[in-house]
């Protein structure tokens, strides 16, 4: 049970040629608030590991995860023996991890980083940011409902004078905000979505989450074995950038926003994908490093379950092949690891998620 507690503690020139506007674009756009909207098991740790090597970036992962999973307002409803034991013995460690505190802390962090003249890069799994009502409206299965708390935007990312003006000024969004983040703050973020084929995502999720007692049939499976949340937020940002205020905020090259990165493109063409991303963000890609020191997580089973590959690596580990997975072939492999019911559930959820994946893939860089 302590594991859960511990867990919480040459291409460049080709790319430039394919996107000729980018060299000028780098000089015109400065995105100081970059937010990676990820999903579990989409190689988001790889993207983050590469990008955090940039000297202009200060990074923070998962500002809302503990509130979603373990705080007093938690929206995760999975119940297992290991989690019941954890909540009975955590000593109130997460009693103060409310969504409001997470928001205030994130806004304060943004202000502190920007005051140093740096960019902030944040990352959170999109599902952890979607409101309960949006979850409920998009999940067919009946599951316990827990309401999302109403958050106050204290505008802590702004100076005091700006804060007063921001609190007085409200601008209606073109479509409803599906997240817990305040409208004002959501508009200031530069969204980067990282996606991956669901036939790779869902089995990886079940393997890694086994330590928490997760199954394909528990009450949290509808949260995590879908790509709906990323598509919902992607469509929100597409609509935002199509309206005058949003288009102005995007600046030149707004047709490339929101940014979508496919994990397998990132793995197999890391230099090309990162070069495109940096240039779209107004960052010089030259300082980026693609090698790093391995990290020993052998004493932490929970972290190892999710981070073994990236922790043991010293650079990008390319895929064995570039072809998209074939579901029937994948299912035969799953049958060696899981029972018939689980394999069928994964197949069904993969089929359901394919439309969302293919839709988002069309928007990838």
Please name every model-derived segment.
Residues 2-33, 284-365:
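PAPS-dependent sulfotransferases, especially Golgi type II membrane carbohydrate sulfotransferases
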Residues 47, 51, 55, 106-110, ...:
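Hydrophobic, Leu/Ile/Phe/Ala-enriched alpha-helical segments that form helix-helix packing faces
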Residues 94-110, 114-117, 124-143, 180, ...:
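Nucleic-acid enzyme cleavage-core boundary/entry regions
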């Amino acid at each position: 049970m302590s594991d859960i507690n511990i867990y919480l503690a040459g291409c460049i020139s080709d790319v430039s040629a394919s996107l000729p506007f980018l060299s000028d674009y780098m000089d015109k756009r400065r995105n100081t608030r970059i937010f990676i909207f990820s999903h579990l098991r989409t190689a988001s740790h790889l993207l983050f590991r590469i990008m955090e090597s940039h000297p202009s970036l200060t990074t923070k992962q998962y500002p809302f995860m503990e509130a979603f999973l373990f705080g007093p307002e938690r929206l995760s409803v999975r119940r297992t023996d290991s989690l019941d034991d954890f909540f009975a013995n955590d000593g109130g460690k997460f009693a103060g991890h409310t969504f409001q505190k997470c928001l205030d802390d994130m806004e304060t962090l943004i202000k502190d980083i920007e005051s140093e003249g740096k960019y902030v890069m944040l990352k959170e799994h999109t599902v952890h940011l979607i409101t309960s009502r949006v979850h409920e409206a998009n999940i067919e299965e009946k599951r316990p409902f827990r309401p999302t708390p109403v958050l106050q935007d204290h505008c802590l990312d702004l100076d005091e004078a700006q804060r007063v003006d921001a609190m007085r000024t409200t601008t209606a969004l073109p479509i409803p905000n599906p997240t817990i983040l305040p409208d004002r703050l959501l508009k200031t973020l530069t969204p980067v979505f990282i996606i991956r084929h669901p036939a790779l995502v869902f089995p990886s999720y079940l393997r890694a989450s086994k330590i928490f007692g997760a199954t394909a049939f528990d009450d949290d499976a509808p949260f995590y074995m879908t790509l709906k949340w990323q598509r919902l937020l992607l469509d929100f940002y597409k609509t935002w950038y199509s309206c005058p205020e949003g288009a102005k905020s995007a600046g030149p090259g707004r047709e490339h926003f929101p940014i979508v990165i496919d994990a397998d493109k990132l793995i197999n063409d890391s230099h090309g994908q990162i070069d495109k991303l940096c240039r779209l963000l107004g960052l010089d890609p030259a300082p980026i490093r693609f090698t790093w020191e391995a990290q020993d997580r052998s004493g932490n089973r929970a972290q190892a379950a999710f981070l073994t590959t990236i922790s043991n690596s010293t650079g990008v580990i390319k895929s064995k092949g570039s072809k998209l997975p074939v579901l029937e072939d994948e299912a035969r492999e799953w049958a060696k690891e899981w029972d018939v019911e689980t394999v069928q559930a994964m197949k069904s959820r993969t089929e359901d998620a394919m439309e969302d994946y293919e839709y988002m893939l069309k928007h990838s860089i």
